[in-house]
């Protein structure tokens, strides 16, 4: 039997709250790590959503803790990581799942949309990388950082200029931090999903290209969680600075969002996500 080396490990997952009607990457990642034997602190801006994920963890016999924090605020990120480390009595794995997007023709992207998109997808990732690295370095025992990137960060996608630029920044941040922190035994990797096949029922079907662009079909949230599990585990003990595409093969087929998508469909998708995107 293969030992993943996660039994008794201590993990933090940001963006782990369970949103009603959406499976969510964060929820799946937190539960999957717990199933592998890790104790998991679930961080979300809404403590109730974090507690919902902890309930799922407890149902599978795992150990979880809920923690509320605004991960878009650097001081609150530092505070939350400190509390999480106290809860767990240390830290071995830190996973960043926070992110958000909207679709806009590039010439229509406002300064506000650009700045918010970078804040949600790149700046907050930097905050969490920095905070977790300080704890890992102080411990002196190494650790694993895993971030959620995107296929849009490695290839072009229409109407995603801001999001693609932010996720490309995440991919580069992963490489830079992996290079700098390797001497401390800290591994830094990323998982880049494409269009996920479940957990996104409120996203209009018309935004996505037909299934034929996915040779292996669209990935599930569990597929994303499995990739995170690999990077967090001892199986990836000599893997760092990498971003793994989990997209059903879409990236090698080219863009998966139709360049001729109707703007009203795009606007419907933006409206569906605005409850999370527009809170600042």
Segments (PLM) and residue ranges:
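Active-site helix of classical SDR
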Residues: 129, 166, 174
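Alpha-helical segment proximal to the catalytic Tyr-Lys
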Residues: 134, 179-183, 237
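Residue(s) in the substrate-gating loop at a strand-loop-helix junction
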Residues: 150
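C-terminal helical subdomain
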Residues: 190, 206-239, 244-248, 270-272, ...
């Amino acid at each position: 039997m293969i030992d993943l080396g996660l039994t008794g490990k201590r993990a933090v997952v940001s963006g782990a709250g369970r949103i009603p009607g959406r499976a969510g990457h964060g929820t799946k990642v937190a539960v999957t790590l717990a199933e592998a034997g890790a104790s998991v602190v679930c961080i979300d801006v809404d403590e109730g959503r974090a507690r919902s994920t902890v309930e799922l963890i407890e149902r599978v016999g795992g150990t979880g803790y809920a923690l509320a924090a605004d991960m878009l605020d650097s001081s609150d990120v530092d505070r939350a990581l400190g509390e999480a480390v106290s809860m767990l009595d240390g830290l071995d794995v830190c996973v960043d799942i926070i992110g958000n997007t909207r679709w806009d023709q590039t010439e229509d992207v406002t300064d506000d949309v650009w700045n918010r998109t970078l804040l949600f997808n790149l700046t907050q990732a930097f905050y969490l990388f920095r905070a977790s690295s300080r704890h890992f370095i102080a411990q002196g025992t190494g650790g694993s950082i895993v971030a959620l990137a995107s296929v849009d960060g490695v290839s072009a996608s229409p109407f995603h200029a801001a999001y693609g630029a932010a996720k490309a920044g995440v991919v580069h941040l992963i490489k830079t931090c992996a290079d700098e922190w390797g001497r401390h035994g800290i591994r830094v990797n990323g998982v880049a999903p494409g269009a996920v096949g479940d957990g996104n029922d409120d996203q209009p079907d018309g935004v996505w290209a037909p299934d034929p662009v996915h040779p292996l079909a669209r990935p599930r949230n569990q597929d994303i969680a499995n990739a995170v599990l690999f990077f967090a585990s001892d199986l990836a003990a000599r893997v760092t600075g990498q971003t793994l595409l989990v997209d059903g093969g879409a990236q090698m087929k080219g863009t998966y969002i139709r360049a001729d998508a109707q703007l009203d469909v795009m606007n419907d998708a933006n409206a569906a996500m605005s409850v999370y995107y527009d809170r600042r």
